[in-house]
């Protein structure tokens, strides 16, 4: 994470372990919850690795690995080591069989509830069949329908999971196939997985590093660690040990990184899973996926539903036994009540709502791999964001210039309209010439029509930035170079820390040469004796050195990478045309040069990021930067994008302002805090948690993959729902551990993408804010959909309760309930997913996962016992009306059930003395089913209208803003008409044609529901915080 020339990953302890093994000491980290070998192994992997191979002399390395730095290992020893250590490959964890993955999709919270309901239906069917009381196959049909719903939604979920691949497979793609090895003094090619520790290997530009290598010889070798760290800045590799950390030092090349240029020879010090990338692979695959908040909410909801279903069922089982029913009959009643209480359509509703939101997010460059992650986006309270490519553009850009004793802001736009300095200045012309000529980068051919910022450049990041800036200011940088032919060049190296080239001048009448140099500012300045000011060479005295130092510190303090530039005209007398410049003999001057100026570069923030961070702050979401970059650069970028807000100070800032030592400052006075990897390594978990609690604005720099994982766990320990962004292989463990992992689609490695739950196709942090908004909206709308879905459970349940306790003919059948749950009500409940937000949801704080539940007590009470009760009254009113108009008055219906269901009784008399056969009574019962069905549907139209809002009036929200909902209501009514009046329905699905006036009976109840809810919302709006608000706002 983050762009940096150096990158710290693990700590170092002096002293090799016995037997050639790496030191086993680990920095102490707090163990996570739970026990077991797997958990202990994961905790050990989180700890920092300690090796010292980079600090040993060549002789000590030869002794440690029983090898030769010139001839390599013997073939026999190599064979023994391969047998002992195994192949140089990443060992994948035991894969999960596909059938197990599919089975998991069938065993979620709601799925289990529906499996139980299906089993109960089958048991009830079997009991009825055994008693010879099987007048209908409704229970069998209901069981089959429930199983079908679970299987179909399970297939959908499995398809979503199937699209993502195993994390370890992406690491395999990083492993090189071949390696050049020297054994017994002979050089040959072998498969990379046959390498062992102690092998002497060679690599060149274009090769992947075949293992963790200690460099013994190198010529201009540079490696690209982007596959490991996500960074694009090339890293120089040489035999010298330059730092105590193996990742800071230049004499270690890491497994799977790319050798960009030059050649190198070295000894293998780690292979396979013992390499750095091997440890990261093991760490990522060992991290278990956390339950998403929505999964936790659904489990909580299932617990409520199951508890209430069993409570109601047990209550009426006891009542049935007391009334005099047989045990088996009472058990059938118990099962019927439990099944009636299960919201069969809810699983499909939740799945479809999440899928619709995922589709909306995909249109906004956010691809969601896990449907449950959609809601998690809205729940998150902390974002641990990578810097490079996420907050920044992942492209080094010239930002500031210092010449003529002034710092100028560079304009990198196409039209150069913002360039404020005088481009006719002789000093500027000289500086521009140096940065153009002393540059090895080149544009890829055939890009003349491509805008300069988007052109592909062959070269490293810094030289690319300089070339593009030169192209924008001069107009044709490549053509400009051709006018100054290069006759000699010394490439940049870690020893000299400068790059030098000598050119002939463009004027054929001027036979002189010009020497141009760029490099580390202090190294360039020490080779200069004069400075160019307003086109004149002035002596580089103490005054100008102080001016240089002030400018250098000012630019460096901005977290920018600074380069110095100088030049020297070589006299014609000493260096005539055709002079043989020799870079080995250095037969030309490299001192007494003329300093031209400084140029600073930075990977600039994306233009949309500051606004996105501000929106996060407004929404109560904390943004933490976690990067591998230098602390100064990290702090500068954090301040520029708003992660560290204006006026916020770190402990160091306060100490500098008060001019006191840092240890005299109260850390709690600092709102912001920047912690580097070395400091983090020395902190125990409680100290890290305290730092996160104390400082609202946090930046972590120079962090390792293990440390990123620890940071995520610490945030979760504070009760936060954590999102992590990343693009490198090193990010994959934290991405998997987070509540939601967000990978970059353009710059992201395959490992990061596979570990993540969501992929940003445009690599833009602002897209995450879009995801937050959609996630919050879907949580609100899921609440509305669930409230709508649950309401009809009561009018579906009460017919069975009255049927058992009062013994009336059954008002509503199982098949009719299925049509309500899985047909007519699905469309309105899904249409609520399209509802617009009632207010600016991005001005609300993230929901508290322990307090703000998807299904809370007010929602259940209001849906079940208020709106649901009104719907039940509507259904029974229509039911008794239909029975009375056919001759069965309400009082006669009480206790009628045993006679009504007796298929041997063919002359049962109604209130008018008319005799009814069993077949006629059965058709009348189907008519009652249909009437009750229509009553529920008419009331549900009012219910879906009131569910459009939870606080605002429906008039404020607008009835027709959600066109999908209007279409769903029309479709619902059409289905109801079709089921009632389509020929053949009585024999197929037990629906009968009904009188038109029976459609009108429930309408007053629907109006009552609407008015009742408007009164509730008015009270909620007028009395915030009151008893009314607490009990009736869901």
From Swiss-Prot:
Residues 225-239 have a biased composition (Polar residues). Residues 14-41, 225-245 are annotated as: Disordered. GO terms for molecular function: ATP binding; ATP hydrolysis activity; magnesium ion binding; P-type potassium:proton transporter activity; P-type sodium:potassium-exchanging transporter activity; potassium ion binding. It is a multi-pass membrane protein. Keywords: ATP-binding, Cell membrane, Hydrogen ion transport, Ion transport, Magnesium, Membrane, Metal-binding, Nucleotide-binding, Phosphoprotein, Potassium, Potassium transport, Translocase, Transmembrane, Transmembrane helix, Transport. One of its GO terms (biological process) is sodium ion export across plasma membrane. InterPro entries: ATPase_P-typ_cation-transptr_C, ATPase_P-typ_cation-transptr_N, ATPase_P-typ_cyto_dom_N, ATPase_P-typ_H/K-transp_N, ATPase_P-typ_P_site, ATPase_P-typ_TM_dom_sf, ATPase_P-typ_transduc_dom_A_sf, Cation_transp_ATPase_P-type. It catalyses: K(+)(out) + ATP + H2O + H(+)(in) = K(+)(in) + ADP + phosphate + 2 H(+)(out). The chain crosses the membrane at residues 98-118, 142-162, 299-318, 331-348, 783-802, 813-833, 854-876, 929-948, 963-981, 997-1017. The gastric H(+)/K(+) ATPase pump is composed of the catalytic alpha subunit ATP4A and the regulatory beta subunit ATP4B. Interacts (via the P-domain) with ATP4B (via N-terminus); this interaction stabilizes the lumenal-open E2 conformation state and prevents the reverse reaction of the transport cycle. This is Potassium-transporting ATPase alpha chain 1. It comes from Canis lupus familiaris (Dog). The gene is ATP4A.
């Amino acid at each position: 994470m983050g762009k940096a020339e150096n990158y710290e990953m693990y700590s170092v302890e002096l002293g090799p372990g016995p037997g050639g093994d790496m030191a086993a000491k680990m920095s102490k980290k707090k163990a996570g919850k739970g026990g077991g070998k797997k958990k202990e192994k994961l905790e050990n992997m989180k700890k920092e690795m300690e090796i010292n191979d980079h600090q040993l002399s060549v002789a000590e390395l030869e002794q440690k690995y029983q090898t030769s730095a010139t001839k390599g290992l013997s073939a026999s020893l190599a064979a023994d080591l391969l047998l002992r250590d195994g192949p140089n490959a990443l060992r994948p964890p035991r894969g999960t069989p596909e059938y197990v993955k599919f089975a998991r999709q069938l065993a979620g919270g709601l799925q289990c509830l529906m499996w139980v309901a299906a089993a109960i239906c089958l048991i009830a069917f079997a009991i009825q069949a055994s008693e010879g009381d099987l007048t209908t196959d409704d229970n069998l049909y209901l069981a089959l329908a429930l199983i079908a719903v679970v299987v179909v939604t399970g297939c959908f979920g499995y398809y979503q999971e199937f699209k993502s691949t195993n994390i370890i497979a992406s690491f395999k793609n990083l492993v090189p196939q071949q390696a050049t090895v020297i054994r017994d003094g002979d050089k040959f090619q072998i498969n990379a997985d046959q390498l062992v520790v102690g092998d002497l290997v060679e690599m060149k530009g274009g090769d992947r590093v075949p293992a963790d290598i200690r460099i013994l010889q190198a010529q201009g070798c540079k490696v690209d660690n982007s596959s490991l760290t996500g960074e694009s800045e090339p890293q120089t590799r040489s035999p010298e040990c330059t730092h105590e950390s193996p990742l800071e030092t230049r004499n270690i090349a890491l497994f799977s990184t790319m050798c960009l240029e030059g050649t190198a020879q070295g000894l293998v010090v780690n292979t396979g899973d013992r390499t750095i990338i091997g440890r990261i692979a093991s760490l990522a695959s060992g991290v278990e996926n956390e339950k998403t908040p929505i999964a936790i909410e659904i489990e909580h909801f299932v617990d409520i539903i199951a508890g209430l279903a069993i409570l109601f069922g047990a209550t009426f089982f006891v009542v049935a036994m007391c009334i005099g029913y047989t045990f088996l009959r009472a058990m059938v009643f118990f099962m019927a009540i439990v099944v009636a209480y299960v919201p069969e359509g809810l699983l499909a509703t939740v799945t479809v709502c999440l899928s619709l939101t995922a589709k909306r997010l995909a249109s906004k460059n956010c691809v969601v791999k896990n449907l449950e992650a959609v809601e998690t986006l809205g729940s998150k309270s902390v974002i641990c964001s990578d810097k490079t490519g996420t907050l920044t553009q992942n492209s080094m850009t010239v930002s500031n210039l210092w010449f003529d004793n002034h710092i100028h802001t560079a304009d990198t736009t196409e039209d150069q309209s913002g360039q404020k300095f005088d481009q006719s200045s002789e000093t500027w012309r000289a500086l521009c010439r140096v940065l153009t000529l002393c540059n090895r980068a080149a544009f890829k051919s055939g890009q003349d029509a491509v805008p300069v910022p988007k052109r592909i450049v062959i070269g490293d990041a810094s030289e690319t930035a300089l070339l593009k800036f030169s192209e924008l200011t001069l107009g044709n940088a490549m053509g400009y170079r051709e006018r100054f032919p290069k006759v000699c060049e010394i490439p940049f190296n870690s020893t000299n820390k400068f790059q030098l080239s000598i050119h002939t001048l463009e004027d054929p009448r001027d036979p002189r040469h010009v020497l141009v140099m760029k490099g580390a500012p202090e190294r360039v300045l020490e080779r200069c004796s004069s400075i160019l000011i307003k086109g004149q060479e002035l002596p580089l005295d103490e005054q100008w050195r102080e001016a240089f130092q002030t400018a250098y510190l000012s630019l460096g303090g901005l977290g920018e990478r600074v380069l110095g530039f100088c030049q020297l005209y070589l006299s014609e007398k000493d260096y005539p045309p055709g002079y043989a410049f020799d870079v080995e003999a250095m037969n030309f001057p490299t001192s007494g040069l003329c300093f031209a100026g400084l140029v600073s570069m930075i990977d600039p923030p994306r233009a949309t990021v500051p606004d996105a961070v501000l929106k996060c702050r407004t929404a109560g979401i904390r943004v933490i930067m976690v990067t591998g970059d230098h602390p100064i650069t990290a702090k500068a970028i954090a301040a520029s994008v708003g992660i560290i807000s204006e006026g916020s100070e770190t402990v160091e800032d306060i100490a500098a302002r008060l001019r006191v030592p840092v240890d005299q400052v109260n850390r709690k006075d600092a709102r912001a805090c920047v912690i580097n990897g070395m400091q983090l390594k020395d902190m125990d978990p409680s100290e890290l948690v305290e730092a996160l609690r104390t400082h609202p604005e946090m930046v972590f720099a120079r962090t390792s993959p293990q440390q990123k994982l620890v940071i995520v766990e610490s945030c979760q320990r504070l009760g936060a729902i954590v999102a992590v962004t990343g693009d490198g292989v090193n990010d994959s463990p934290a991405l998997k551990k987070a509540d939601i992992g967000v990978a970059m689609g353009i710059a992201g490695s395959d490992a990061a993408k596979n570990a993540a739950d969501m992929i940003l196709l445009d690599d833009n942090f602002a897209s995450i804010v879009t995801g937050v908004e959609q996630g919050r909206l879907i949580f609100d709308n899921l609440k509305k959909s669930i409230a709508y879905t649950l309401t009809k459970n009561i009018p579906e349940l009460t017919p069975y309760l009255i049927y058992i306790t009062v013994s009336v003919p059954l008002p509503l059948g199982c098949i009719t309930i299925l049509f309500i749950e899985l047909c007519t009500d699905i469309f309105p409940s899904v249409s609520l997913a399209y509802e617009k937000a009632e207010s600016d949801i991005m001005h609300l704080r993230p929901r508290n996962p322990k307090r703000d539940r998807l299904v809370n007590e007010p929602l259940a009470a209001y849906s079940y016992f208020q709106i649901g009760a009104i719907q039940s009254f509507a259904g029974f009113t229509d039911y008794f009306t239909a029975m009375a108009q056919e001759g069965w008055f309400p009082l006669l219906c009480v206790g009628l059930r045993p006679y009504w269901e007796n298929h041997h009784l063919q002359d049962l008399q109604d209130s008018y003395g008319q005799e009814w056969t069993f077949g006629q009574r059965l058709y009348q019962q189907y008519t009652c089913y249909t009437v009750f069905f229509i009553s529920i549907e008419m009331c549900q139209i009012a219910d879906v209208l009131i569910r459009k809002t939870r606080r605002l009036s429906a008039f404020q929200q607008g009835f027709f803003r959600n066109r999908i909902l209007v279409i769903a209501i029309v479709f619902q009514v059409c289905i109801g008409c079709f089921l009632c009046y389509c020929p053949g329905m009585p024999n197929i699905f037990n629906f009968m044609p009904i009188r038109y006036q029976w459609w009108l009976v429930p309408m007053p109840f629907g109006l009552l529901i609407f008015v009742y809810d408007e009164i509730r919302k008015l009270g909620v709006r007028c009395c915030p915080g009151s008893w009314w608000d607490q009990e009736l706002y869901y």
